[in-house]
Each structure stands twice: as structure tokens, then as C-alpha cells.
Amino acid sequence: MNRRRGILFALASVLLVSVAQLSMRWSMTRLPRPDQWLSVPSVDSVALAVVLAAIFAYALSMLCWLAALRDLPLGRAYSLLSISYALVYLLAASLPLFNESFSFSKSLGVALVMLGVITINTRPARAPELRSSP
């Protein structure tokens, strides 16, 4: 197990899934409902391309996640996924094209999530105990 490599793959997964989520949000505010994509005469091709790119980013994120699971204990790896919730909230609220707003309660929630991620990932990992056969 290579912890550093596992963390890098997990963070790459977080980054890709966050970009995918923001891209889908941007696209879906510019497109009709998905069931109307084939019947509407003019669908925004850029927004549709961004949706497809976001789906590809999700697939890459999953591959990075699988690679991370090879090198990290599940409890540590899974906690790193929480960073995506914080990242998406912060970017959506700070970038004008998303028209989202900051709130004290949401920001406090993000801070608590990040504190939890830091707490889980800064304490030393215990080696698994081997059980002897009876």
C-alpha cells in the first residue's frame, strides 16, 4: 500500500467529480428537460457537450477512486470524498455563473465536514490486528 499515491488518486477523484457536478449544473440551466432533448428544434450544443464531458469526468473519477481504494483504508478514503461537497458548495457560491449564495449555516456545515476529514486523516492509522486460528 502506498498512502501518498492513494491520497493523490482520491483527491483526483474529488476534483473530477466536483468539476462534473458543477458542469452538469451549468448545463442543465441551459437545456430543456432531458426527455425533450430530441424533440426540441434547437438544443444548446455547447451545454450538451458539457454534459457529455461531465459524464466522462464522472467515469474518470470512478477510475481514480478504484485506484485510491487499492492504497487506502476505506474509512480514510471515504472521508476524502466529503471534500467534494465542500468544494462544490464553495465554488457554486463564489462563481457568479451559478448564482448560488453563501449562508452561515451552510458554511458552518462545510467547516465541520472539513474538520472531520482532517481529524480522520491526521491520526496515525493502526495496523490491522491479525487473528490467530483456534
Curated annotation (Swiss-Prot):
**Stretches that traverse the bilayer:** 6-26, 46-66, 78-98, 102-122
Q: What does the UniProt keyword field contain?
A: Cell inner membrane, Cell membrane, Lipid A biosynthesis, Lipid biosynthesis, Lipid metabolism, Lipopolysaccharide biosynthesis, Membrane, Transmembrane, Transmembrane helix, Transport
The membrane topology noted for this protein in its Swiss-Prot or TrEMBL record is: Multi-pass membrane protein
Which residue intervals are topologically Periplasmic? Answer: 27-45, 99-101
Q: In which compartments does the protein localize? A: Cell inner membrane
Please indicate which superkingdom the organism of origin belongs to.
Bacteria
Q: Does the keyword Membrane apply?
A: yes
Check the record and name the InterPro entries matching this protein. Flippase_ArnF, Small_drug/metabolite_transptr
- Determine if NAD is one of this entry's keywords: no
* GO CC term, one of those recorded: plasma membrane
Enumerate the Cytoplasmic topological stretches: 1-5, 67-77, 123-134
Q: In which pathway does it act?
A: Bacterial outer membrane biogenesis; lipopolysaccharide biosynthesis
Q: Which GO terms describe its biological process?
A: lipid A biosynthetic process; lipopolysaccharide biosynthetic process
Q: A GO molecular-function term, please?
A: carbohydrate derivative transmembrane transporter activity
Q: Give the multimer and partner information.
A: Heterodimer of ArnE and ArnF.
Q: What does this protein do?
A: Translocates 4-amino-4-deoxy-L-arabinose-phosphoundecaprenol (alpha-L-Ara4N-phosphoundecaprenol) from the cytoplasmic to the periplasmic side of the inner membrane.
Q: HAMAP family given for it?
A: Flippase_ArnF
Q: Which family does it belong to?
A: Belongs to the ArnF family.
What protein does this entry describe?
Probable 4-amino-4-deoxy-L-arabinose-phosphoundecaprenol flippase subunit ArnF
Organism in which the protein naturally occurs: Pseudomonas fluorescens (strain Pf0-1)
The gene it comes from is arnF
